[in-house]
A protein has these predicted regions:
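Short, small-residue-biased leader/transition segments that mark boundaries at the very start
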Residues: 2-6
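Structural motif
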Residues: 8-13, 39-41, 62, 81-83
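Conserved active-site segment immediately N-terminal to the catalytic lysine
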Residues: 54-70
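Active-site C-terminal subdomain of aminotransferase-like
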Residues: 68-173, 177-180
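Conserved PLP-binding catalytic core of the aspartate aminotransferase-like
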Residues: 175-204
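Active-site core of PLP-dependent enzymes with the aminotransferase class I/II
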Residues: 15-34, 45-52
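Hydrophobic beta-strand scaffold residues
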Residues: 38-39, 177
Length: 207
């Protein structure tokens, strides 16, 4: 079997479906008190501004790497990411790249924990459920290398500031946010006349 670690888990998206940021720390406390693991679905861009799921007590973090320099491309292909605590590391599916040093003392990257893999333990391997998204991962690596830590924070800050500016402007003309809690760069609004009427009005103005 997969073991007890897979039997009780809770998934929490933050930002959630409506764009709101959840209280991951509170969710982690509740889950751990009940003996469950907390998995957080995160936007990688938001992680540049806010406390990470790991810092908030989550056990696993997953997400879509599309915001990291990948065009929309009619829906794909994209790359997903998954991170966990050391205690759960061997439960991860797929190949894991680790950082080490080569014979000259320079930084190097290797495939690590290969005892989990198909060529060694085929019947227990997890990589047979994975697809190869190395090209997308390389795109994300190039993007992150180009913008750097400060650049990534600046992009995230621009996303945050402009979304909040837009939300405030909409509220000033009678279209308030539906949710009142904190959000990152997406939000839902109330449409007093209904969404259909709003769409017609936007179309008439070529918006």
């Amino acid at each position: 079997g997969l073991g007890d670690v897979y039997k009780r888990q809770v998934y929490l998206a933050s930002p959630n479906f409506l764009g709101g940021l959840e209280d991951v720390s509170a969710a982690a406390e509740i889950c751990h008190a009940a003996g469950a693991k907390l998995i957080v679905g995160a936007n990688p861009m938001a992680l540049a501004l806010f406390k990470t799921p790991g810092e908030a007590g989550a056990d696993v973090c997953v997400g879509d790497g599309q915001p990291l320099g990948m065009p929309l491309s009619y829906g794909g292909p994209y790359v997903g990411f998954m991170a966990t605590r050391t205690a759960l590391m061997r439960k991860l599916p797929g190949r894991i790249v680790g950082q080490t040093t080569d014979v000259d003392g320079k930084r190097a990257f290797v495939l690590t924990l290969q005892a989990r893999e198909q060529h060694i333990r085929r019947e227990k391997a997890g990589s047979n459920i994975c697809s190869n998204q190395a090209l997308c991962a390389l795109t994300a690596a190039c993007y992150l290398g180009a913008v750097g830590p400060e650049g990534l924070r600046e992009v995230a800050r621009q996303c945050y500031d402009k979304a909040h500016y837009f939300a405030d402007k909409l509220a000033s003309i009678g279209l308030p946010r539906r949710e009142k809690g904190p959000f990152f760069h997406e939000f839902a609004t109330e449409c007093p006349g209904g969404a259909e009427k709003m769409l017609v009005a936007l179309e008439e103005r070529d918006i």
